[in-house]
UniProtKB/Swiss-Prot annotation:
Keywords: Amino-acid biosynthesis, Branched-chain amino acid biosynthesis, Magnesium, Metal-binding, NADP, Oxidoreductase. It is an enzyme of class 1 (oxidoreductase). One of its GO terms (molecular function) is NADP binding. HAMAP family: IlvC. One of its GO terms (cellular component) is cytosol. The keyword Magnesium applies. NADP(+) binds at Y25, G26, S27, Q28, R48, S52, D82, E83, I84, Q85, G133. It comes from Staphylococcus aureus (strain MSSA476). Involved in the biosynthesis of branched-chain amino acids (BCAA). Catalyzes an alkyl-migration followed by a ketol-acid reduction of (S)-2-acetolactate (S2AL) to yield (R)-2,3-dihydroxy-isovalerate. In the isomerase reaction, S2AL is rearranged via a Mg-dependent methyl migration to produce 3-hydroxy-3-methyl-2-ketobutyrate (HMKB). In the reductase reaction, this 2-ketoacid undergoes a metal-dependent reduction by NADPH to yield (R)-2,3-dihydroxy-isovalerate. InterPro entries: 6-PGluconate_DH-like_C_sf (IPR008927), KARI (IPR013023), KARI_C (IPR000506), KARI_N (IPR013116), KARI_prok (IPR014359), NAD(P)-bd_dom_sf (IPR036291). PANTHER family: KETOL-ACID REDUCTOISOMERASE, MITOCHONDRIAL. Binds 2 magnesium ions per subunit. The gene is ilvC. This is Ketol-acid reductoisomerase (NADP(+)).
């Protein structure tokens, strides 16, 4: 049975009197740091010089190189991209850890797959908001929150659980509810969701639909509208009320087509392929491939990215979005 923790369930403020170093000031970093600061905690930022360093200064934080921030802190929350956490930990965090420090993460990748192996005398915990940083911050300011996960990997001090829950409350997460998990469960489910459904699955489904229509002689512009542009309408309905809300909101024609044609596209073979993806995540094949490619300068990653950038659906989409000024441009600068 899933247990959800709320504000009233956090009986002890285990962060009281402790200094918190937030390492990184990107999407999650700025939200965690500002929420904690607004709740009265002593927060410093650890980051390398650059735009984020300057932004943290502008936002009123004491900002230090990572090693200096860690030296001062009792709790260290690492909010850096997965691929750079290992080097930053080895060179700047690990040498400055002290007994009974608490080392925290918002995603379990590097702990679960052994890239980062903390000493046995420090606490290791996870607090993972289920939403992007700007939403974590905005909902906090509005008086609500984004639901989050928390988990304990090591409890050297005997207080890791209290510290993790206090941290979750500090960023506002217990207003909405915090679900207990493990580093293993959070990591494997997160990667599976990204690869099989949210990113890999959806993007390939859209591409295949686009190609099917274009190859059948339909105009690429119409294909784009039908399989990509209108996706937002469906996702918004699903986000607000699940698949039942989608089916309630669409036409009877669309709903009937959902029932009779959906299983023809997503066949039992697709589920078997999903199981294979999950197996590659569980046994470390995916993480090893990602880690090795990172060591080799992301040659495979950048090659795959460039191939996808050149797909016809991307070219058509860029042209059509010029016709829609009501869409706030989020195009990536090259």
């Amino acid at each position: 049975m899933t247990t959800v923790y709320y504000d009233q369930d956090v009986k002890t403020d285990a962060l009281q009197g402790k200094k918190i170093a937030v390492v990184g000031y990107g999407s999650q970093g700025h939200a965690h740091a500002q929420n904690l600061k607004d709740n009265g905690y002593d927060v410093v930022i650890g980051i390398r010089p650059g735009r984020s360093f300057d932004k943290a200064k502008e936002d009123g934080f004491d900002v230090f190189p990572v090693a200096e921030a860690v030296k001062q802190a009792d709790v260290i929350m690492v909010l850096l991209p997965d691929e750079i956490q290992g080097d930053v930990y080895k060179n700047e965090i690990e040498p400055n850890l002290e007994k009974h420090n608490a080392l925290a993460f918002a995603h379990g990748f590097n702990i679960h797959f052994g890239v980062i192996q903390p000493p046995a005398d420090v606490d290791v915990f996870l607090v993972a908001p289920k939403g992007p940083g700007h939403l974590v911050r905005r909902t906090f300011v509005e008086g609500s929150a984004v639901p989050s996960l928390f988990g304990i990997q090591q409890d050297a001090s005997g207080q890791a659980r209290n510290i993790a829950l206090s941290y979750a409350k500090g960023i506002g997460a217990t207003r909405a509810g915090v679900i207990e998990t493990t580093f293993k469960e959070e990591t494997e489910t997160d990667l599976f969701g990204e690869q099989a459904v949210l990113c890999g699955g959806v993007s390939k489904l859209i591409q295949s639909g686009f190609e099917t229509l274009v190859e059948a002689g339909y105009q690429p512009e119409l294909a784009y509208f039908e399989v990509l542009h209108e996706m937002k309408l469906i996702v918004d309905l699903m986000y607000e009320g699940g698949t039942e809300n989608v089916r309630y909101s669409i036409s009877n024609t669309a709903e009937f087509g959902d029932y009779v044609s959906g299983p023809r596209v997503i066949t039992p073979d697709v589920k078997e392929n999903m199981k294979a993806v999950l197996t590659d995540i569980q046994n470390g094949n995916f993480s090893n491939r990602f880690i090795e490619d990172n060591k080799n300068g992301f040659k495979e990653f950048y090659k795959l990215r460039e191939e996808q950038h050149g797909h016809q659906i991307e070219k058509v989409g860029r042209e059509l979005r010029e016709m829609m000024p009501f869409i706030k441009s989020k195009s990536i600068e090259k």
